[in-house]
C-alpha cells in the first residue's frame, strides 16, 4: 500500500528539521548546505503525502456518514470528489518517488554539429539554434554562445551554447541525438527534397570539484582567431585549442575577446565533455535498464525527423508525429514534444520501480 511507503519520508523530514536547527549544524556551512538541499528535495513529497493521507481520512469520514439522514447526500457528493482525487494524488506521489537524475537542475552545454548534407546541414543548425533560443526565452533560460564555426553559406558547421536556468538539463536532455531534416534547399532548381542530418549533444555544466584534470594531461595551443571564410579577425593569438591527451578530446574556442577568456570557456566545455563520457560509461553498465528509457542521448541515435514539405515533425522514440513544424520552429514550442517524452519516461520508470 502506498501509504505505508511514505512513513520513512516523514521521519527523515522531521529529522532534517531537527538537525538544521541544531547549533552544531549551523556552524558547519558545508553540512548545512547538504542537509538543506536534501530537505528541499523531500519537501514536495512530504507536502503531497500529507494531502494524500488527509484525503484518505476524509474518504473514511464521509463513508461513515453515508447512512446519516441529514448528511448522507452531502457525504455522497463529497465522497465522489475525493475518490476521483485519490488516484491523481497517488500518481503524483509515485512520480515524486522516482529516483532523481542528479543532473536535472544543472545548466547545460548544447553542442550542435552539421552532419551529412553539407551546406544544407549547416543551415539547419542555424535554424535549430534560433528555435532553441526562442525556447530558452519562453522558459526564462539565458543562452550564450561559447564557441561557433560558421557555415560557408550561412548557419553553423558547429556551435556550442551554454543554457542557464533551473531545470535546463531536465528538459533539454531529450534533445541529444541525431536530428534528420528533409526539405528543398534554396539552391535546388528542380524542387527535389534533400535529406541532411545534424547531431546534438547535451552536456551538464559541472563544478571544478566534480571533474579534476591533471594539467600534465593537457596540450594547450594558442593561435590567431579566424572569422567567416577563415579570414583573420584580430592580430593577437587569442584563440585557444586544448587537447586532453588521455581521451583525445579537443576543444577550440575563439569567440572571446581575450586568450584568458577563451581558455576559461574551453576548459568548461572540456570538463562537461569528460563528465558526459564518465556518465555514458556509467550508464552503459546499466544498459538493460537503460534500454527501456526514452533515448540514450547518444549522438548516433536518430531521434527526430523534420519534414518541411509536409510541415511534419516526428519523434521516433515515442512514435509521436505533429503537423506543426512551422509553429514549433518559429516559436520554439519544443515542450509539445518534450512533455510527451517526459510522460513516457516516467511511465517506463514507474514500471521499473514497481510503483
From Swiss-Prot:
SUPFAM superfamilies: Release factor (SSF75620). Methylated by PrmC. Methylation increases the termination efficiency of RF1. GO terms for cellular component: cytoplasm. The modification N5-methylglutamine is found at residue 231. Its main location: cytoplasm. The keyword Ribonucleoprotein does not apply. Residues 280-303 are annotated as: Disordered. The keyword Protein biosynthesis applies. Pfam families: PCRF (PF03462), RF-1 (PF00472). Residues 280-291 have a biased composition (Basic and acidic residues). Disulfide bonds: none annotated. Keywords: Cytoplasm, Methylation, Protein biosynthesis. It is found in: Cytoplasm. GO terms for molecular function: translation release factor activity, codon specific. Peptide chain release factor 1 directs the termination of translation in response to the peptide chain termination codons UAG and UAA. Belongs to the prokaryotic/mitochondrial release factor family. This is Peptide chain release factor 1. The gene is prfA.
